[in-house]
Amino acid sequence: MKKLTTNEIRKMWLDFFKEKNHHFLEPVSLIPVEDPSLLWINSGVATLKPYFDGRKTPPSPRLTNSQKAIRTNDIENVGVTARHHTMFEMLGNFSIGDYFKKEAISFAWELLTSDKWFAIPVEKLYITVFNEDIEAYEYWINDIGIKQDHIFRLTRDTNFWDVGQGPCGPNTEIFFDRGEKWDKENIGPRLLAEDIENDRYIEIWNIVFSQFNNDGFNNYSELPRKNIDTGAGLERIASIFQDTPTNFETDIFWPTIKQIENICDANFKYSIENYFDEKAEQTKINTAFKVIADHVRATSFAIADGVFPGNKDRGYIIRRLIRRALMKGMELGINGPFLSTLVINVIDVMKDFYPYLLEKQNLIETTILIEEEKFLKTLSKGYEALNKMIENDKKVTGKNALLLFESYGYPIEQTIEIAEDRKVKVEIEEFNSLLEQAKEQARNARKDLKAWDKQNEIFTKINVESEFTGWEETSHKNAKIVYIFTDDEILTEATDKEVYVILDKTPFYAEKGGQAADKGYLVNKEARCEVIDTQQGPNHQHIHKILLDGSIKIGDQIDAFVDETKRTLTMKNHSGTHLIHSALRVVLGETVMQSGSYNDEHGLRMDFTYNDSIKAEELIAAEKLVLDKINEKINREVYFCSMKDAVSKYGALAFFTEKYDDIVRVVKFGDFSSELCGGTHVDNTIDIEDFMITGLESKGSGVYRVKCLTSKKAINEYLNTEFNKLLKLIQEQNSKYENTKLIQADQNIENIVKESVTKTISKESIQELKLILEKLSAALKIYERKIEDLLTSKKLEQFKAFEPITNDKGVGTIEQQVNGLNIKDMKNLVDEYKNKFEKLIIILTSETEEGNFVVVGVSEKIQNEYSAIEIFKNLTISPKGGGNSSLAQGKF
């Protein structure tokens, strides 16, 4: 059999299907786009959903890809099984209403067995089919020539793909027989027939025949357009061609494993032979190597695609992978950060097909190193907190486990492992319940979805043509109405109601890429329509949500007018977003990467990644750089080109969380800024007029959000509002001082207030007033403490003349009412008397608006004979409280 590298296998697959007229789809980001149902891209077909459900027209009915994917539902199995991975590559070929069963089976067989391609011996291949799929079974037997003892008809459990509702169908699977060496009990084909987990028969290809629709009640009807969805695990195929016990000894992971051997304690080595030897200690060592190699690969790709360690969603998964790998390193005697040094091994293996990893190398290494260092600190703090919990409660409550998770970022898996070592229980059900409550709150906050986000049947049927003209115009005469619908039905006409309409040509920008939707009006003789929102449809149509006054029908001509004021302000802010992004990359470094943005007529905000603290002077420098570029009067340039040219020829920044078409739009402002962007922008940077950063906040885990304004009018309004707001806050603070000034004046406060009066409205004065407010607040706190101490001292003075009544043993007793004193003042008074008299029992009571209090004190010298807590318990007023032999306190 051929010996093929992973790169050769991938290339051969893609070349084969290109010869069969399949369009090659470049691999996309691990972060799903416009699919809230998925946390990660988890299969090859996940990226093709819009093509299969009709929302978008595919570039070809025949498609092929090699798509990276992540599945994290059972991370704990990684390293334990032979073929389980966090991230994997799925080879696929797909037909959308084109070929079906016979062609799909023929293609698979040709690629696997032809001497030109994989050249796998026919006798090594076994097939399974759904037992009711006679067509597929007979084709395998009669046309392909599979022997009866090499094909098995299995049940719905193994050979029918169905998620409960929607398209579904039977599937056929192809297995490779690795031979008796991998079948210790010599069970043979029964392993397949009875679906027994094994390492002899390796599934290399799954072909799903999507031919039915499940109505949700298990009623099945034939689909009018049948599809093919296939998947073949690249790592599994590599293991077959390289004849390795598991996927981890292939050329994908082996360089990383060998590098781990160089880093770890010399006593630890990876053993290939242990697959057969099964020595428990070596199995544990091998597992650690596998986990590290797997997790560092998945983490590297995720970070390159814009996911950073955090405490929720994808960020938590990446944090968990890094921390789990770091813990496995400790099992191999590695006690410091080391994962970042393995990134280069991952890149060397994967760079041919994923060249962008090289560009992201510094970002990946820095992010992982920072997270490693954080976790080493977290381990120490979290471990201390966990120990206290175990000592105090003899268990870990769900509430405490959540506290460790949220406050310390301490993984629940780590809490469980440590608790098990200490033989104590973790109330995991309570933890899961509390965690689910937190998630539910987050989900509820996101439930305000637009009608078209429901992707209902009406929406997916939209296939009319619509052209966007709004890059160069804000109005369009005689546009034709080509589609009218509501949430519930498709219409041919409408009168006086809220509906959605599509025009053959429209200047209205649909919300996308961080830019808010245009609003405005549609007008003709019969109707005036207020456009209150614009969103993008399944094939790039711009869908207008309108409040209709009058009547419209399909085919009507109508004039479209965008709200120019809103559009102009939005354009300034969108161009400002591009400039501040470039400025931050200049000031902070090219590891800065935009991870989200939003701009409308009110301002702009941009989220970006940066793994360090940001100094005020760095923000000032970025703001100044943007202002410089505005004043340089740089013309906007726009180019339509291929993605390759956009990056190589025009230096455009592309964000891997976005999906791009074959032809992309590049927006450039000289050599300073070049980005892929479909939004509207100013013609020249001078049109932005002005620029100001109004805020910076950390979103956690290396993600920041910067908020900015453009245009002189918006900035002047902001400065006026902020200036007056800050002055009001300063005046409020000063009023607190004035109310107590007669007790004791404070020159420092008066000087600070005088300083604020000298300021006039400007960008600089806003920052200065903020500093003045901070200084004033701090000075006022010190002043208030002084006044409180002074008033307390005066209040206590009237109660300092009590004299004890002394018994024959020389022990004095003071029993007095000190009404108006709080418990703190009473304790201070008791301490003063105890210091004044060596042998004293003192009992003070106080009636206040907050309640009635009692404090009992006993001097240290007589505590062998008298106890404050015992005296407290025997008081006739029956107080409730506690204490010790020296002091007791409570209420009555």
Curated annotation (Swiss-Prot):
Residues bound to Zn(2+): 574, 578, 677, 681
Cofactor: Zn(2+)
Entry keyword annotation includes GTP-binding: no
GO molecular function, one term: ATP binding
PROSITE patterns, alphabetized: AA_TRNA_LIGASE_II_ALA
Annotated cofactor note: Binds 1 zinc ion per subunit.
Entry keyword annotation includes tRNA-binding: yes
One Pfam family hit: tRNA_SAD
Catalytic activity: tRNA(Ala) + L-alanine + ATP = L-alanyl-tRNA(Ala) + AMP + diphosphate
Compartment annotation: Cytoplasm
GO BP, sorted A to Z: alanyl-tRNA aminoacylation
SUPFAM superfamilies: Class II aaRS and biotin synthetases (SSF55681), Putative anticodon-binding domain of alanyl-tRNA synthetase (AlaRS) (SSF101353), ThrRS/AlaRS common domain (SSF55186), Translation proteins (SSF50447)
Keywords: Aminoacyl-tRNA synthetase, ATP-binding, Cytoplasm, Ligase, Metal-binding, Nucleotide-binding, Protein biosynthesis, RNA-binding, tRNA-binding, Zinc
EC identifiers of the protein: 6.1.1.7
Cellular component annotations (GO), alphabetically ordered: cytosol
EC primary class: ligase
UniProt function note: Catalyzes the attachment of alanine to tRNA(Ala) in a two-step reaction: alanine is first activated by ATP to form Ala-AMP and then transferred to the acceptor end of tRNA(Ala). Also edits incorrectly charged Ser-tRNA(Ala) and Gly-tRNA(Ala) via its editing domain.
This protein's domain notes: Consists of three domains; the N-terminal catalytic domain, the editing domain and the C-terminal C-Ala domain. The editing domain removes incorrectly charged amino acids, while the C-Ala domain, along with tRNA(Ala), serves as a bridge to cooperatively bring together the editing and aminoacylation centers thus stimulating deacylation of misacylated tRNAs.
Record-stated family: Belongs to the class-II aminoacyl-tRNA synthetase family.
NCBIfam families (alphabetical): alaS
Protein name: Alanine--tRNA ligase
Organism the protein comes from: Mesoplasma florum (strain ATCC 33453 / NBRC 100688 / NCTC 11704 / L1) (Acholeplasma florum)
